[in-house]
Amino acid sequence: MPATSKPHSSPPPGLQVCDVTWGPGGSKLFSHLSLDFPLGVTWVCGGEGCGKTSLLRLLAGELQAHKGNITGHGSVFWADPHSDAHESASALAYFASLQARLGPWNASRLAYLTDGLGITEHLHKALYMLSTGTKRKVWLTAAFAAGCSVTLIDEPFAALDRPSIAFVNQELQAVHAQGQGVWVVADYDAPAPWTSADIFQLDRSL
């Protein structure tokens, strides 16, 4: 991994990764990695096993760097799509638990998101009863409604239907244009109309 890479040249960064070294089991997936994430959306893209999810977990504080520092300010939203921590809770109970921790959400905004993603009828169901795609829609609704200083999303379009993919991409473009916090979104590729200026290509071969 190169010593220093900047996903964007401007505006000033809101989240910084400085000289981070980390890897599972003593290996070095990241070696002296430095990144500057500004306000808006930065896509972290790359193939299987390149470290996209590990980077998000480092930014969320779930993993601790062996060396280096990660600096950001304010609240952080991160929902691990592989976690079953909230499986027995309903979507509404999950939202309530996040609001208790992160602060109240705008009710009209939440209604707009649940309607846009087509999950209104599923809000009273336990998460374990939902399909993979519907469960991901619940997490995405929470991410957009929470309005955190830092929002971390892993594979936002996985298992989604086409209308939902378009809706999520539209909402990501909106928060990017308005500079609403730092958003780091990991996926294999970024869809149109995102450009290279919005993308950091994470590649273990670099």
Predicted regions and their residues:
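Hydrophobic anchor residue at the start of the ABC signature
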Residues: 140
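Conserved catalytic loops of ABC-family nucleotide-binding domains
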Residues: 163, 171-193
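ABC ATPase C-loop
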Residues: 144-145
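Conserved ABC ATPase "signature" region
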Residues: 108-122
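ABC ATPase nucleotide-binding domain signature region
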Residues: 46, 54-100, 190-192, 206
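ABC-family nucleotide-binding domains
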Residues: 154, 160-161, 165
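A short, flexible loop at the N-terminus of ABC-type nucleotide-binding domains that lies
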Residues: 1-39, 63-64
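Conserved ABC ATPase signature
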Residues: 126-133
